[in-house]
Every structure is written in structure tokens, then in C-alpha cells.
Amino acid sequence: MRSRPTHSMEATTVAVAVALALAAALAPTPARAQAPAPAHQIAEAVQAAPAPQRADATVLGFRADGSVVTLREGANELVCLADNPTQEGWSVACYHESLEPFMARGRELREQGVTDSGELAQRRWDEADAGTLAMPEKPAMLYVMTGDRFDAASGTVANGFLRWVIYSPWATPEDTGLPTAPTGPGAPWLMFPGTAGAHIMITPPPPGGPGN
């Protein structure tokens, strides 16, 4: 079992809220809207992935009842998740397959009624520390794209904005040389240092404003 540094409740709550906002597509909730056709979901989901990796990525989408379903089995290392039609806004994500146990556990906990963002993170961190939840053994990538909507006809995202997250479980500033807060637009920094959920955030400057 790994030891984990303690964090103030306020700092943990704020940090968890930011992380979950970036990965909103990763946590399905009970359906309130009709799910788009599978072809539409596949086309939108892969928008978060680098272009050379889109065609062979595994794609997860949503059934009419809001549950997650595999829409396409892939042939490379990426898993992409379509926009959740039950949530406001538009967001898709792609991540390395080694992150699937962590992501799937988050979806499972939400289906079990865990809705608090802090508890959702802490439960998974505790399980990872105990060795019951597999985490990546090497740095693993998560791509998160947000936007206004996906236009299937043109295959483009209106006002698309892509963020990069590199999961590096239990990484610390001492291990990486990274700061634990943003230092400027687009500058990398380490979020949740020392925890199973430690990851490097890279947020480019959005059009018309600074990033972090």
C-alpha cells in the first residue's frame, strides 16, 4: 500500500472540480436526451485524438438509456468516448488504453450513485493505493476536446478547444521538476501531486484569452 500526502479539503475540492470539468464526457448519468446514431458518435468521439490515430481507435458511446456501449473495437492503443447527450455542453475525450480501468471505475461509481466529485476521485485513489484498481505503469495520455457542437456533415467541431493531460500516477514535483500550479498560458503543471490521480495539465491559450 502506498502512502499519500494529505491535502486541505478546500484545495482537494477545487482541484477535483477542475479535473472533472475537463473530463465531463467520461462520466455518464441517467439519460435525459436521445443518443445520436452510432456513426455520429464515432465521428465526434475521435475528434479528440491525433489525426493519425483516429481510424484505429476503440470508440465508446451511449445507448438510449444513457449507459456506455462499445461502438467500435479498435486496433491501436487509444480509447475514445463520445459526447454524453445527458450533459450540457459538448465534450469528447480519448485516452490511452492503460487508463481504461480508472475511467471505467469512475463511470461505475457514478452509476452506483456517487455524485460528489471529491468522493469520486478519492474512492479511486484509495483503491489504486490499495492495489485493487490498476493504474498506468508509464505516463498515459488523455485528450479532452470541448466545443459548441459537432457538425457531422463537415466533420468539424464549432469552436473546438483541445486540452492535453498526461497521467503519471504518484508523480511529485521532486520527481518531475514541474510546478503544482499554472505558471503561464500553455505551461505544463502537475495536478494532484503524489496521488494516484497525479497528472500533467497542458491547457493552450483559448482564442481571445489566456490559458493555464
Across the structure, where does each feature detected by a protein language model lie?
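Bacterial N-terminal signal peptides
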Residues: 13-27
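Primary mode marks residue(s) on the alpha4-beta5-alpha5 output face of response regulator receiver
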Residues: 34-212
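N-terminal secretory signal peptides that target proteins for export/translocation
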Residues: 1-11
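Sec/Tat signal peptide C-region and signal peptidase I cleavage site
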Residues: 29-33
